[in-house]
């Protein structure tokens, strides 16, 4: 099967203050691929995610970000979202006064919005996939009455409803109290079956091994990319060197 490039990051350099966080990162994500990014704390994983999404304050000083064949380096977050890209934050936001069912409807794929019954069915399916009982959560508010883990699950449910071309997931298991990683993997597989590509920022070996491809970032550079187990073994052997090279930061 011929692979089709969805995202291509070329020679990406990003500064935060006076410090260079990303130092010439090169990365690709193919259509319908799960690509995991691993590395020590402070290596630049989250900075890469925020830069690709176009978050304010993460403007590259050099490099290109090609999405669907278009250089989006000068496009803002809204424009990138309209092109089919989304980001699930490591720390999900609160939305005072918005019920879960309305929040999930906001970014829902238009093909489901056309019919109210289909939309409601999709919302229920999404909540069940993230292990939340629809009857208990549909009319809850996305505010401080929900735990961080519950809001994280709702964020994942939102992406399930959205079915974007590219979902960037920053530590998708963070704050979620789970016995195993099977439910997160189930979300990954569901989205992939729907034709979505995933760029997953994680430090969990269990999630990285579920990816099609893994890239290791160390001190702002991608130092190895390829088979999940091969990259994982390389990281275990070289992780001490990586930690020594990484300053404080994201």
From Swiss-Prot:
<dbReference type="GO" id="GO:0016887">
    <property type="term" value="F:ATP hydrolysis activity"/>
</dbReference>
<dbReference type="InterPro" id="IPR003593">
    <property type="entry name" value="AAA+_ATPase"/>
</dbReference>
<dbReference type="InterPro" id="IPR017871">
    <property type="entry name" value="ABC_transporter-like_CS"/>
</dbReference>
<comment type="similarity">
    <text>Belongs to the ABC transporter superfamily.</text>
</comment>
<dbReference type="InterPro" id="IPR010230">
    <property type="entry name" value="FeS-cluster_ATPase_SufC"/>
</dbReference>
<dbReference type="InterPro" id="IPR027417">
    <property type="entry name" value="P-loop_NTPase"/>
</dbReference>
<keyword id="KW-0547">Nucleotide-binding</keyword>
<feature type="domain" description="ABC transporter">
    <location>
        <begin position="7"/>
        <end position="244"/>
    </location>
</feature>
<protein>
    <recommendedName>
        <fullName>Uncharacterized ABC transporter ATP-binding protein MJ0035</fullName>
    </recommendedName>
</protein>
<keyword id="KW-0067">ATP-binding</keyword>
<feature type="binding site">
    <location>
        <begin position="39"/>
        <end position="46"/>
    </location>
    <ligand>
        <name>ATP</name>
    </ligand>
</feature>
<dbReference type="InterPro" id="IPR003439">
    <property type="entry name" value="ABC_transporter-like_ATP-bd"/>
</dbReference>
<keyword id="KW-0813">Transport</keyword>
<dbReference type="Pfam" id="PF00005">
    <property type="entry name" value="ABC_tran"/>
</dbReference>
<dbReference type="GO" id="GO:0005524">
    <property type="term" value="F:ATP binding"/>
</dbReference>
């Amino acid at each position: 099967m011929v692979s089709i490039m969805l995202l291509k990051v070329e020679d990406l350099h990003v500064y935060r203050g006076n410090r260079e966080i990303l130092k010439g990162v090169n990365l690709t994500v193919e259509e319908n691929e799960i690509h995991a990014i691993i590395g020590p704390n402070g290596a630049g994983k989250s900075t890469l995610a925020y830069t690709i999404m176009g978050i304010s304050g993460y403007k590259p000083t050099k490099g290109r970000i090609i999405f669907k064949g278009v250089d989006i380096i000068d496009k803002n977050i809204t424009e990138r979202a309209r092109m089919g890209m989304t980001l699930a934050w490591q720390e999900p936001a609160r939305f005072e006064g918005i019920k879960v069912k309305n929040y999930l409807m906001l970014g829902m794929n238009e093909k489901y919005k056309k019919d109210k019954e289909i939309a409601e069915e999709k919302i229920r399916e999404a909540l069940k996939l993230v292990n939340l009982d629809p009857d208990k959560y549909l009319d809850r508010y996305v505010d401080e009455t929900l735990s961080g883990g519950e809001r994280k699950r709702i964020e994942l449910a939102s992406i399930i409803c959205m079915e974007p071309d590219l979902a960037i997931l920053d530590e998708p298991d963070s704050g979620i109290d789970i016995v195993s990683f099977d439910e997160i993997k189930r979300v990954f597989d569901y989205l992939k079956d729907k034709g979505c590509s995933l760029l997953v920022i994680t430090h969990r070996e269990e999630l990285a091994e579920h990816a099609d491809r893994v890239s290791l970032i160390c001190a702002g550079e991608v130092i190895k990319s390829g088979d999940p187990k091969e990259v994982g073994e390389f990281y275990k052997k070289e992780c001490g060197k990586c930690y020594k090279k990484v300053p404080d930061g994201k």
